[in-house]
Amino acid sequence: MKSDSPVHRESHTGCQSPCPLRCLPARLEGSTKRRLAANARERRRMQGLNTAFDSLRKVVPQWGEDKQLSKYETLQMALSYIMALSRILSEAERYSRTDPEEWTNIQYDHIEEEQCLSYMEVRCPRDCDRYLPQTFSH
């Protein structure tokens, strides 16, 4: 019994066998391979994204060491940090034309002496040097 239904004709397309059921495993196998390949690509993409977030977390200031920042919090902190650095640079440029010492005094007026010493001892996080050339290579 041959069926002329659209389903039978579609599943039979390109198949040399008189029975469409014989073609089904080959089609499923091809579909499964494509799905596995797509899953592997997505897994690599997500691993790359997570690695990038881990790298960003290492260079963005964090208030506490008790918990890892979420991706959203990491992006928010990075944005705040970039804006603060940008503000500092624009203020420094503005004051450097008139009175550089005044700018320095403004920056350090609110810092106690012992805090200032601890800030001066702060070192760049491990692997920091690795990111700077990439960031400012333009």
From Swiss-Prot:
Function: Transcription factor that binds to DNA at the consensus sequence 5'-CAG[GC]TG-3'. Positively regulates the determination of retinal ganglion cell fate and formation of the optic nerve and retino-hypothalamic tract. Required for retinal circadian rhythm photoentrainment. Plays a role in brainstem auditory signaling and binaural processing. Regulates the differentiation of olfactory receptor neurons. During retinal neurogenesis, activates the transcription of several genes such as brn3d, coe3, cbfa2t2, glis2, elrC and xgadd45-gamma.
GO biological process: axon development; neural retina development; neuron fate commitment; positive regulation of retinal ganglion cell axon guidance; positive regulation of transcription by RNA polymerase II; regulation of transcription by RNA polymerase II; sensory organ development
Keyword terms, alphabetized: Cell projection, Developmental protein, Differentiation, DNA-binding, Neurogenesis, Nucleus, Transcription, Transcription regulation
GO cellular component term of the entry, any: axon
Ranges where the bHLH domain occurs: 33-85
Note: Inhibited by Notch and ESR1.
Classification via InterPro entries: ATOH7_bHLH, bHLH_dom, bHLH_transcription_factors, HLH_DNA-bd_sf
Protein name per its UniProtKB record: Transcription factor Atoh7-a
Any one Gene Ontology molecular-function term assigned to this protein's record: protein dimerization activity
Keyword Iron-sulfur: no
Compartments, as annotated in UniProt: Nucleus; Perikaryon; Cell projection, Axon
Pfam families: HLH
Organism: Xenopus laevis (African clawed frog)
